[in-house]
Design a protein with these regions (language model features):
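Generic detection of intrinsically disordered/low-complexity segments and helix-coil linkers/edges
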Residues: 9-11, 58, 67, 147, ...
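Beta-propeller folds
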Residues: 17-20, 24-469, 474-475, 483-485, ...
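Bacterial N-terminal signal peptides that target proteins for export
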Residues: 2-13
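Serine-hydrolase catalytic core recognition
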Residues: 269-270, 324, 332, 338, ...
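Absolute N-terminal positional cue centered near the fourth residue
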Residues: 4-5, 29, 770
Length: 775
């Protein structure tokens, strides 16, 4: 890569298309120091960074009790540092909310209690008949069949279903006793309790299986065995990871029927993942332009036998189509099914009769770019009206429809996004939702009447609120964080949201047993890009900052669809690593380019038919802004990112105008032909009809000996199911052909996210050392 000549650097300060509109700090957020900062107190080391949980780890596992009185979640307990052979185990913690549902809180907030200890979890999942000792080779989750994956409340909220990798146990809270429901050495997944609380369902051997809670009778399959590539109620990798479908089957509200998705992967391409011991396993990996799964939906009475025929829902020919969502209506007879064409530009919402299989289309959405699938569909109790979200006007908003497809009301309006439809309280005529109305950098809980009137914000603290509303819609669990506040859980009454929380965590959800260190302030910026769009960015400056000095800069990249780097939220381990590097004397800079989330569909559209182009143009504008700052050392620019961010890092290191000296790329996509069809075709369309866009989107477009002069390190898990190892190998092969090379940090048998503590420590240590050495 050629160095950006000094005349261009000098000219950058007069580029009128790149101006700072505001050093706009969030309300309550420090705008940045006017005089040098003292060094922050509190130890911040690589070990401390690697111990920090992912920012949303606890929120994913949260479950309200059916009576809406207690909320519980998983929390990982690490074994003592000097223990041998002991692996981490999940515990279940809970917060009781003893206040009457509609009463204001009184007295001090309630503190969390340990509901099920790690020892009890392990004993319950192991069962009396299983071996009590085994060899443990590492801390990877897959090596521990007794690790708690999830849990569910019983209908009477007196017990918990403990869900392991191979076993299910029924745990009685009052006595602390448990009994085994399902055991064995074969994996199981997607366990759930029927709405009437009498049956547990799960997937084993690619098919639906049921077991009685009371009798503990032998598990029975709802369907006969099928071909190993025909999944009955089980999700394949694309549907689980690209459409984020929670489960491949659903109980009817009265527990009389089960609807499931049949996924036929027989014609779909497979990819082989090879472990360090020479064993291999295949995963379904539909490639662009190739075959995609053939999907159908069936319904069957829960009490029927495997030999009884199910009802097939009449969706017409489904080859070349996706069915990304389906759900029951409250009446227990009808299903709502979303049908999406392969180009992902036409989405139909279909009403299906579960008894006859007949269907009718309720509404159709069309978009010339692509349609983003969401979970925003809730039916009212009469099963004749529903709330639905759409981005048809450029921003996602809520609409009230009837099942004949008539729009009854538009509930929300404005140049902001509804990010989640939380709940409907029909008794009050209120819809609860999460949105960016206050700022794209924040998210808050709101309510609005079913006629679209009286929109009210229910959360006050500046930052990010992720609300989980309780059954009965009396209170909500609020996962709150900001750039300087680790994630905390508060339980708040919906009738008194401005009052003190009725319950809260005492120390937040930071690393167990560790207080968060004091942090350097984050300055939020609004930058106007060269084509007129406005981008959000942030700066973190070193302690004792002196504007008369020159500082190196690390540009952190995320940049992909659905991602948002610049937001007032706790950043987890990555955010702490940025703080660590700032303490070491680096300025940290991040910018959300066009194509990222929370700014509306208009802001996403410029990446259509070309990935990496608009994103890098916007990131170059960010660098040009940095060049206007007198305290930035323009010859010492580094870049770092993971996944899509890693893809952009490789682009950046080969980008002709910008002289990045060092780049750290985690799991970078090198060629989108290697990626799964659902994601790649959504943005690039057909690889034959739009071959030029596909070719231009490769990270190696500008590779040549002339344009690669910096230091590049690539980190990759060898069993990464998202970004396959062939990407990293192709990059190194092409670099060698050009007479160049990159440093590679391989994590054997690890996936896309490096999760086990020893490997996380190595990852953050190598990232840190790489920039200290090369920048």
């Amino acid at each position: 890569m050629t160095q950006l000549n000094r005349s261009l650097l000098a000219a950058a300060s007069v580029f009128v298309f790149l101006t700072v509109l505001a050093p706009a700090a969030m309300p309550g957020q420090n705008r940045g120091p006017e005089k040098p900062l003292a060094a922050p107190s509190g130890a911040l080391t690589v070990e401390r960074v690697s111990a920090e949980p992912d920012a949303d780890e606890r929120a994913r596992s949260l479950h309200w009790s059916p009576d809406g009185v207690r909320v519980a979640w998983l929390q990982l307990r690490q074994p003592p540092a000097k223990s041998r052979g002991e692996v981490p185990q999940q515990e279940i913690w809970a917060i009781p909310s003893d206040a009457p549902p509609n009463a204001p809180p009184a007295g001090p907030p309630r503190e969390p209690i340990l509901l099920v200890s790690a020892e009890k979890v392990t004993a319950s999942l192991r069962g009396s008949d299983a071996p009590r000792h085994r060899r443990l080779d590492d801390d990877d989750d897959n090596s521990n069949p007794y690790l708690l994956r999830n849990f569910a409340w019983s209908r009477d909220h007196s017990s918990l279903l403990l869900i392991g990798a191979q076993s299910l146990a029924w745990f009685e809270i009052a006595t602390g006793s448990s009994r085994t429901l399902v055991s064995g050495d074969q994996p199981l997944s997607d366990a759930a309790i029927s709405p009437d609380g009498k049956t547990v369902s799960f997937i084993r051997d690619h098919t639906l299986t049921l077991v009685s809670v009371q009798s503990g009778a032998a598990a029975r399959t709802l369907l006969p065995p099928a071909h190993e590539d025909i999944l009955e109620g089980e999700l394949d990798w694309p549907y689980r990871n690209e459409f984020h479908l929670a489960r491949g089957y659903e109980w009817s509200p009265d527990s009389s029927r089960i609807a499931w998705l049949e996924i036929d992967d027989r014609a779909v391409a497979k990819y082989s993942l090879r472990s360090s011991n020479g064993e291999s396993r295949e995963i379904v990996s539909p490639k662009a332009g190739g075959e995609i799964p053939v999907v159908r939906i069936f319904v069957k009475r829960a009490g029927s036998g495997a030999e009884d025929s199910p009802v097939e829902i009449d969706l017409g020919p489904t080859k070349g189509l996706y069915l990304p969502r389906f759900t029951w209506l409250p009446d227990g007879r009808h299903l709502a099914i979303q049908r999406l064409n392969r180009r992902q530009q036409t989405l139909e919402l279909i009403l299906a009769d579960a008894v006859t299989g007949k269907t009718q289309t309720m509404l159709t959405e069309k978009d010339q770019y692509w349609i983003n699938i969401s979970d925003d569909l809730r039916f009212l109790g009469d099963s004749k009206r529903f709330v639905w979200s759409s981005q048809r006007a450029g921003f996602r908003h809520l609409y009230l429809y009837d099942t004949d497809g008539k729009q009854l009301a538009q509930l929300t309006h404005g140049d902001w996004e509804v990010t989640h439809l939380n709940a409907i309280d029909e008794s009050k005529g209120l819809v609860y939702f999460t949105a960016t109305e206050k700022s794209p950098l924040e998210s808050h809980l709101y309510s609005v009447h079913l006629d679209g009137s009286g929109m009210t914000r229910l959360t006050a603290m500046p930052g990010t609120h992720e609300a989980h509303i309780a059954p009965g819609v009396a209170s909500f669990a609020d996962f709150y964080s900001s750039q300087t506040t680790p994630t905390r859980l508060n339980i708040v009454s919906l009738d008194h949201p401005d009052q003190t929380a009725v319950a809260k965590t005492s120390s937040g959800f930071s690393a167990p047993g560790q207080s968060p260190p004091s942090l350097l302030p984050v300055e939020f910026l609004n930058l106007k890009l060269h084509l007129g769009a406005e981008a959000h960015a942030f700066l973190i400056k070193p302690p004792a900052f002196d504007s008369a000095k020159k500082y190196p800069v690390i540009v952190y990249l995320a940049g992909g669809p659905g991602e948002q780097l610049v937001r007032d939220a706790w950043g987890g381990a990555t955010g702490l690593w940025m703080q660590l590097m700032a303490r070491k004397g680096y300025i940290i800079f991040g910018l959300d380019n066009q194509g990222t989330a929370a700014r509306g569909h208009y802001f996403e559209e410029p990446i259509h038919l070309r990935l990496g182009g608009q994103e890098m143009a916007d990131q170059r504008d960010g660098v040009l802004y940095l060049n206007t700052l007198p305290y930035v050392d323009t010859m010492r620019l580094g870049v770092c990112g993971w996944g899509y961010g890693g893809f952009l890092v490789v682009h950046a290191m080969l980008d002709r105008p910008v002289p990045f000296k060092a780049g750290f790329a985690g799991a970078p996509v090198i060629d989108w032909h290697f990626y799964d069809a659902i994601f790649a075709e959504r943005y690039l369309d057909d690889p034959v009809a739009h071959a030029d866009g596909w070719d231009a989107s490769t990270a190696l477009e500008n590779l040549s000996p002339t344009f690669f002069k910096g230091s590049l390190m690539v980190a990759q898990g060898t069993e990464d199911e998202v970004v396959h190892l062939e990407n990293a190998l192709t990059l190194q092969d092409r670099l060698l052909d050009a007479g160049k090379s990159a440093d590679f940090l391989l994590f054997p048998d690890r996936g896309h996210v490096i999760e086990d503590p020893p490997s996380r420590l190595v990852l953050f240590s190598r990232m840190t050392d790489f920039f200290v050495k090369n920048l």
